From Swiss-Prot:
Protein known as: Methylthioribose-1-phosphate isomerase
Catalytic activity from the UniProt record: 5-(methylsulfanyl)-alpha-D-ribose 1-phosphate = 5-(methylsulfanyl)-D-ribulose 1-phosphate
Subcellular location: Cytoplasm; Nucleus
Primary role: Catalyzes the interconversion of methylthioribose-1-phosphate (MTR-1-P) into methylthioribulose-1-phosphate (MTRu-1-P).
Keyword Transcription regulation attached: no
Species for this entry: Neosartorya fischeri (strain ATCC 1020 / DSM 3700 / CBS 544.65 / FGSC A1164 / JCM 1740 / NRRL 181 / WB 181) (Aspergillus fischerianus)
Phosphoprotein found in the keyword field: no
Keyword terms, alphabetized: Amino-acid biosynthesis, Cytoplasm, Isomerase, Methionine biosynthesis, Nucleus
An MF annotation (GO) of this entry: S-methyl-5-thioribose-1-phosphate isomerase activity
NCBIfam families reported in the protein's UniProt record: eIF-2B_rel, PRK05720.1, salvage_mtnA
Pathway: Amino-acid biosynthesis; L-methionine biosynthesis via salvage pathway; L-methionine from S-methyl-5-thio-alpha-D-ribose 1-phosphate: step 1/6
Length: 387
């Protein structure tokens, strides 16, 4: 396996991200200096993936605060800076309301700066510096959590998903859950990377993931970058793949934008269909997500609001004209691929019922259902807080 892709570059006061709209044609970094830059990057899907958008949002605000400190333009009052940060966080959360990681990060950061603002002697600068440190710690923790998720998922698959005669796993994944969706390494794609590091990966399959093609554009890009054995398929080929005895798919591993208290999982559109197919074909279906993606305040999938995307994402497609580019310059063109006037329904996510999920891979272990056939995720947080 080659070196792992790095999609977020940060040093205090300086933040840059790979422009994912340019991938896989051009590997171009764009500078994010303000929360407004981050909001547009998230909304326009220049950065995507629940953990990544939370980190980029937090670091964008940290960068702006650092700039205000450097240029001596920050208010001296702790309360004023606290309110400034809260307003900016609320604005950033509005860029992608479905992603629980973003709202969870905002809530935790608000709590951190509120506590600091209430301490004796707090100033605007000390509150801002407390926020900057907390945002930087988020990125460090996310990468560490991803490595643990990868390890836990790989070990579970080797133990529970492989037939006795097999020592390597063939895994299917959906959308993009790697370095481009997180601080690095990835969640579901991190499991595939961990299998490869253990020399236990036979083959990886990634779906195209229509209509935004995160699989063909982003996951395929990461798999090729890391030189992992992999094959791209269209979404409609999954049933045929699982039925193919030569392919021998052992597990499907996906990410999550939100996991409800009962285990129902909102993820990229098409995930639900994969889970149904996995159940029919007897293939293990796993969700890989950090604890921050689990929302105990959301009781079930029925409570999850599903974002709808523009019709143009379905009726048009963007890419370079074949052969019309030089080494570093690619001109992207948009073409129509659907009949004009047709109505379009374009939900960004669907909800997979917990009954179709075999396990939820987290940084503290793989959570399976109890003897009653239900996930008890609340116990996970009790156990984790006590440890």
């Amino acid at each position: 396996m080659a070196s792992i892709l790095q999609a977020i570059r940060y040093s205090r006061g300086k933040l840059a991200i790979i422009d994912q709209l340019q991938l896989p044609y051009v590997e171009k970094f764009i500078t994010i200096q303000t929360p407004e830059d981050a909001w547009h990057a998230i909304k326009e899907m220049r950065v995507r993936g629940a953990p990544a958008i939370a980190i980029v949002a937090a670091l964008a605000l940290a960068s702006e605060l650092n700039t205000l400190i450097v240029h001596d333009k920050l208010s001296s009052g702790a309360e004023e800076v606290k309110l400034f940060i809260r307003e900016k966080l609320d604005y950033l959360v509005s860029s992608r309301p479905t992603a629980v990681n973003l709202s969870d990060a905002a809530r935790k950061l608000e709590s951190t700066i509120s506590d600091h603002a209430d301490t004796p002697g707090a100033t605007g600068r000390t509150v801002a510096e407390a926020f900057i440190r907390a945002a930087e710690d988020m990125m460090t923790k996310d990468l560490d959590d991803n490595m643990r998720i990868g390890k836990n998922g790989a070990e579970w698959i080797i133990k529970h998903a492989l037939a006795a005669r097999k020592s390597t796993a063939t895994v299917l994944t959906h959308c993009n859950t790697g370095s481009l969706a997180t601080s690095g390494y990835g969640t579901a794609l991190g499991v595939i990377r961990a299998l490869a590091s253990k020399k236990a990966l036979e083959h990886a399959y990634c779906t195209e993931t229509r209509p935004y093609n995160q699989g063909s554009r982003l996951t395929a890009f990461e798999l090729v970058h890391d030189r992992l054995p992999a094959t791209l398929i269209t979404d409609s080929m999954v049933a045929a793949l699982l039925a193919n005895t030569k392919a021998e798919v052992d597990a499907i591993v996906v990410g999550a934008d939100r996991v409800a208290a009962n285990g129902d999982t909102a993820n990229k559109i098409g995930t639900y269909g994969l889970a149904v197919l996995a159940k029919y074909h007897g293939v293990k279906f796993l969700v890989a997500a950090p604890l921050t993606t689990i929302d105990l305040g959301t009781k079930s999938g029925e409570d999850i609001v599903i974002e709808e995307r523009p019709a143009a994402e379905v009726t048009k497609i963007r890419g370079p004209v074949d052969g019309d580019h030089s080494a570093d310059i690619v001109k992207l063109e948009t073409v129509h691929i659907a009949a004009k006037g047709i109505n379009v329904w374009n939900p960004a996510f669907d909800v997979t019922p917990s009954t179709l999920i075999d396990g939820i891979i987290t940084e503290v272990g793989v959570i399976e259902k109890g003897t009653d056939g239900q996930f008890h995720l609340e116990r996970l947080f009790i156990d984790n807080s006590a440890s």
